Swiss-Prot record:
Species of the source: Shigella sonnei (strain Ss046)
PANTHER family noted in UniProt: L-SERYL-TRNA(SEC) SELENIUM TRANSFERASE
Protein's job: Converts seryl-tRNA(Sec) to selenocysteinyl-tRNA(Sec) required for selenoprotein biosynthesis.
Keywords assigned by UniProt, alphabetized: Cytoplasm, Protein biosynthesis, Pyridoxal phosphate, Selenium, Transferase
Name of protein: L-seryl-tRNA(Sec) selenium transferase
GO cellular component assignments: cytoplasm
Gene3D superfamilies given in the database record: 3.90.1150.180, Type I PLP-dependent aspartate aminotransferase-like (Major domain)
Length: 463
């Protein structure tokens, strides 16, 4: 060991001496004596490695307290951090899908702070059913006889098939054998549920007679799957639920539908593309309809099944139901969200998902123009900051081919180097409230469709 190396090692402080420093008092109060000591030991080991490998001290050795504070602050951050979604995808699966209405947030907070009547009947002073209140709401909204709630729509499909078709065949059109994110495939779910898939028709065309010829003594269900995350166009033919229900009645086979995204209102009244609604399928005679709570419905992650009382009873009594049931926070948020649908005239203001989807391109354009000047002044030395038209998407497999006119702030490096865009995007991801945009066509795009808090936006970007 050289004299210089020995000198560097000798400059490393003792932990006891560091802890006596006044700058460590608040750190010990905030993070605890044990964790601070543990980190200091780790940092001393790191410093010794740096000395051994590069014959120098780490830069942070000049201020140990500052480095400890920085590391512990980062460590204390929640893994689920709030971000500003400027990707242009409203229901972004990776960013948590639907924002919750204030009423839902308050309901969840109350359910977390206090005992609640989750499975307690106040009238009878006895055990109740956790789905009962929501089932009544869902029946009122959809016209169904009964309802069942589980933790997501994949679980809803699994339960629906396991409880009604295990050991039997389920007839599905080849054009509806969907795969959604995470490699969730209808054929795989059927195998897990103990069903046998009976494919009929072709990818682009399926006729009523295809279903008719497939039905045999072992057929349990005729199933429709809404292809919410892709579209087949051109020379196509599909059987709608009303026609399939008529066939099912003739053959004494019930019809079920996996609706996927599941809107409870006619979106066309807001100028958006129309999606099939559970109440339409219930009116058509479908026995069971499953859909998601956190997509177009705008609530928490949940799987909702509505339909005929006798079939819902089979779902409720199946062993899987307990494994898949929703917890009190989910039920509280979902109930509060569903109650908003009882007052449709205020829905587009009180339901964040609908509010964001219905923002006009003109309003977003004005917002972008208002924000462009301060950002250009701050970033103009390196980037051209412009207002550009763009197209938002709904996301989460909803209305996959439809786009919503929007406006974005774009950042283009003056030197044309893509690495500068990557660096800027990385800097924004490191902000106290990370900013998530997208890089496309030599620009960094910030689609403002989902931006409602302009003050926080500017506070972050002008740091």
């Amino acid at each position: 060991m050289t004299t210089e190396t020995r000198s560097l090692y000798s400059q490393l402080p003792a932990i006891d001496r560091l802890l006596r420093d006044s700058s460590f008092l608040s750190l010990r109060d905030t993070y605890g004596h044990t964790r601070v000591v543990e980190l200091l030991r780790q940092m001393l080991d790191e410093a010794r490695e740096v000395i051994r490998d590069s014959q120098t001290l780490p830069a942070w050795c000049e201020n140990w307290a500052q480095e400890v504070d920085a590391r512990l602050t980062k460590e204390a951050q929640s893994a689920l951090r709030p971000v500003i979604n400027l990707t242009g995808t409203v229901l972004h699966t990776n960013l948590g899908r639907a924002l919750q209405a204030e009423a839902a947030v308050e309901a969840v907070a109350q359910a977390m702070r206090s005992p609640v009547t989750l499975e307690y009947d106040l009238d009878d002073a006895g055990r109740g059913h956790r789905d009962r209140a929501l089932a009544q709401l869902l029946c009122r909204i959809t016209g169904a006889e009964d309802a069942c709630i589980v933790n997501n729509n994949a679980a809803a499909v699994l339960l629906m098939l396991a409880a009604t078709a295990s050991g039997k065949e389920v007839v599905v059109s080849r054009g509806e054998l969907v795969e959604i994110g995470g490699a969730f495939r209808i054929p795989d779910v059927m195998r897990q549920a103990g069903c046998t898939l009976h494919e009929v028709g072709t990818t682009n065309r399926t006729h009523a007679n295809d279903y008719r010829q497939a039905v045999n003594e072992n057929t349990a269900l005729l199933m429709k799957v809404h292809t919410s995350n892709y579209s087949i166009q051109g020379f196509t033919k599909a059987i709608d639920e009303a026609e399939l229900v008529a066939l099912g009645k003739e053959l004494d086979v019930p019809v079920v539908t996996d609706l996927g995204s599941g809107s409870l209102v006619d979106l066309s009244q807001y100028g958006l593309p129309k999606e099939p609604m559970p109440q339409e399928l219930i009116a058509a005679g479908v026995s069971l309809v499953s859909f998601s709570g956190d997509k177009l419905l705008g609530g928490p992650q949940a799987g909702i099944i509505v339909g005929k009382k006798e079939m819902i009873a089979r779902l409720q009594s199946h062993p899987l139901k307990r494994a898949l049931r929703a917890d009190k926070m989910t039920l509280a948020a979902l109930e509060a969200t569903l109650r908003l649908y009882l007052h449709p005239e205020a829905l587009s203001e009180k339901l964040p998902t609908l509010r964001l989807l219905t923002r006009s391109a003109e309003v977003i354009q004005i917002q972008a123009q208002r924000l462009q000047a301060p950002l250009a002044a701050h970033y103009g030395a390196e980037f051209a900051v412009q207002v550009m038209p763009c197209l938002s998407q709904i996301g989460s497999g909803s209305l996959p081919v439809d786009r919503l006119p929007s406006a974005a702030l774009t950042f283009t490096p003056h030197d044309g180097r893509g690495s500068h865009l990557e660096s800027l995007a990385a800097r924004w991801r490191e902000l106290p409230v990370p900013m998530i945009g997208r890089i496309y066509d030599g620009r960094l795009w910030l689609d403002l469709r989902c931006l409602e808090d302009e003050q926080r936006f500017l506070e972050m970007l002008l740091k």
